[in-house]
Amino acid sequence: MVERHTAEYTRRRVLGTALGAAAGAYGLTQGLTGTPQVWAAPDFKLRAPEPNAKRGGVLRYGILSAPAHFDIHQSGTVSNMGTQGAMYDNLIRRNPLDSGQTIIPDLAQSWEIAPDSKTYTFFLRKGVQFHDGGKLTADDIKATFSRIIWPPQGFSSPRTPLFSAVSAINVRDDYTVEFQLHEARPQNFMLGAFASGWNVIVRKKTLEEHNYNLRQVMDYPGTGP
């Protein structure tokens, strides 16, 4: 029997993005070490959106050091995630409200895991657009993860080892993408890998326009708030 996962999705999460990135880093470390840890849930509540909120303006954000470059996929530091994270979405993400102990939908509204744990199928939300107006499709998911899993020459991908079992990425239709594994991995490990805060989804067209290297590209479009 195929295992299917789905949950309610909310866009009110600019604060949650930063917390989710930290939770994602924690989750992957936990999965690699195999040592169970318990974190207390943060004592905070997200504010309800203002009914007549002002659009535009400038957000100033203080960090300890400037990012060495702007390519999140080639980064492993919070300096990139803290400044860029809110501009992008992930396929799935860790829930910032429980310190990342659960996985929740992001661009994927639901997913299925085959009984043998060797096929992961993600079903995307429809109507999502990049900041430049381009429509999000499964081709963008494939292009993003192909770059992370099988990096081109000269590309540094810190999270490639997490996906060593992935043998193929198949686009079934505009809103369905499938990851095939040549051998099973623990489901919580694989879902944690997909949910890493640095695995943001980038438009395929953007990658092609910049020869799959975004280190010096400051403002490539995302789908985040």
Predicted regions and their residues:
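Extracytoplasmic/secreted proteins, especially bacterial periplasmic and envelope-associated proteins
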Residues: 86, 106, 136, 140-144, ...
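N-terminal secretory signal peptides
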Residues: 1-13, 22, 32, 36-37
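C-terminal segment of N-terminal export signals and the immediately downstream linker at the start
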Residues: 30-60
